[in-house]
């Protein structure tokens, strides 16, 4: 079942449930009124004959009827709110496991893609894209040793080769992965090809998961795709890239964005590629780049994180210019007046290095059906709630939508936001985001925005290092941030240089566990983390994908690391 279908079923179930409760309540009221009328009518007759009336028996009768109705209502509530959802989840797992065992299905989907083979092990289906710890969790978390899994990520095979910019998306059914293959050196503007793979999570005989590759695609057609972002969709993968023909600085200086491409690759090896023409891009954006991290398939839409430069005095520029987000670290006192800090924060969105463009984050939203890419739209984040535009990632966890934003500006700690926009009501004018306060996991960067800086400045630096929420930072009914909120990932624990990749589990203010490599000078770059659970054994695992510096084959090699999260 896709994420969109699951959400639709849940909304339908809630609507039926609410209607049922209203009908039961009205029935109780009607019965109570009828009983009261009958009792009153009977009592009037008795008074006329006997002139004596004792209301105790009447009240006892009414109370007994109401108690029995309340007991029935409580049973209905329990069955509808607890027992039935658990039964549905159990039935879903059984059905998906049965489909996997049969290993075939009718090619009834529009892309004729058989879905029977492309299905994760039943042990993991319901442990993917879920909160993995309770909101009240007060135990300890650690990370086990590295688990020896076969790598699903190919590396460079020549000293001058390079693999960069990994993007990984995992859903209940399968995973999708992509990276850039640079033929000579690691410069972003160099000619390159794009590698794409899809596969499933399986259980190994050693009692931990591994990632089995089912299909691969090597896009080697002379088109220089860059900064690609991937999404796992029903039956396959969707890949969004921009086509690089000049340097990054030249892109921002231009007034027409580079070509954008959306590629669909299905399990039956159907390949469809579209060139995007987006109505609200030309005239507003100098350049519009995929944000590297994976997107999501949400409520029938493909949603990719994007960022780029808004042209001065364009409609989009005017709607965002002057807006600013100013998070504060309670442990850090910044110099200057509040007004000076506000003015600096406002100015941090406009970068002279990039021709004075306003660097903006946004989401590219496309309906998936029939690959209707002419209906794609770009929706801006509200800059009063997010930092300067940067690379990022979208997640769906426990039905909630999240956005990781690379800390490319002056705030050096990790940046995660909960998206509060309801896409079921159509595309919004702006995306509303709620910052998840955290003050740890800094990234290295150039001065004055090296690791540990929390005061406004004008910078564009840092490195991509997304995070994974282990439980809900904003539980339902809570008025603030969950004090037990935990998250995990991998980051480069250094002030300036891109070195010392380190695995961690942390709260907003405290590292719960950190584990690095023997050599703290180990070169590294981008890191991406995805955590999931074996619902049979209840064991939690995190997959850390890290660009590791290489002295043998190319400047960087992308390596997948798997660790168990140890709960005590």
Swiss-Prot record:
CDD domains: HN. It catalyses: Hydrolysis of alpha-(2->3)-, alpha-(2->6)-, alpha-(2->8)- glycosidic linkages of terminal sialic acid residues in oligosaccharides, glycoproteins, glycolipids, colominic acid and synthetic substrates. Glycans are attached at residues 44, 111, 268, 280, 382, 513. The chain crosses the membrane at residues 19-39. Its EC number is 3.2.1.18. It is a single-pass type II membrane protein. Residues 224-229 are annotated as: Involved in neuraminidase activity. The keyword Transmembrane applies. The keyword Transmembrane applies. It is found in: Virion membrane; Host cell membrane. One of its GO terms (biological process) is symbiont entry into host cell. It comes from the Viruses. GO terms for molecular function: exo-alpha-sialidase activity; host cell surface receptor binding. Residues 1-18 are intravirion. One of its GO terms (cellular component) is virion membrane. Keywords: Disulfide bond, Glycoprotein, Hemagglutinin, Host cell membrane, Host membrane, Host-virus interaction, Hydrolase, Membrane, Signal-anchor, Transmembrane, Transmembrane helix, Viral attachment to host cell, Viral envelope protein, Virion, Virus entry into host cell. Disulfide bonds join 162-186, 176-237, 228-241, 334-455, 366-376, 449-459, 531-542. The C-terminus (head domain) is involved in binding the cellular receptor. Homotetramer; composed of disulfide-linked homodimers. Attaches the virus to sialic acid-containing cell receptors and thereby initiating infection. Binding of HN protein to the receptor induces a conformational change that allows the F protein to trigger virion/cell membranes fusion. Neuraminidase activity ensures the efficient spread of the virus by dissociating the mature virions from the neuraminic acid containing glycoproteins. This is Hemagglutinin-neuraminidase.
